[in-house]
UniProtKB/Swiss-Prot annotation:
Gene3D superfamilies: Ribosomal protein L39e. This is Large ribosomal subunit protein eL39. Belongs to the eukaryotic ribosomal protein eL39 family. It comes from the Archaea. Keywords: Ribonucleoprotein, Ribosomal protein. The keyword Ribonucleoprotein applies. The lineage of its organism: Archaea, Methanobacteriati, Thermoplasmatota, Thermoplasmata, Thermoplasmatales. GO terms for molecular function: structural constituent of ribosome. GO terms for biological process: translation. InterPro entries: Ribosomal_eL39 (IPR000077), Ribosomal_eL39_CS (IPR020083), Ribosomal_eL39_dom_sf (IPR023626). One of its GO terms (cellular component) is ribonucleoprotein complex.
Amino acid sequence: MARNKPLGLKIRLMKAVKSNRRVPGWVMVKTDRRVTQNYKRRNWRRSNLKA
């Protein structure tokens, strides 16, 4: 990808990076392990972003 990106695209890509993380440990403790997985996880090879 190009080095110089438009700001809007950069922000959308950064949001995708942030949201692609596992559920924090404190959330599992708080919800008594009812929430253990992030179902919106995305793999860079398997699915594309609409950024």
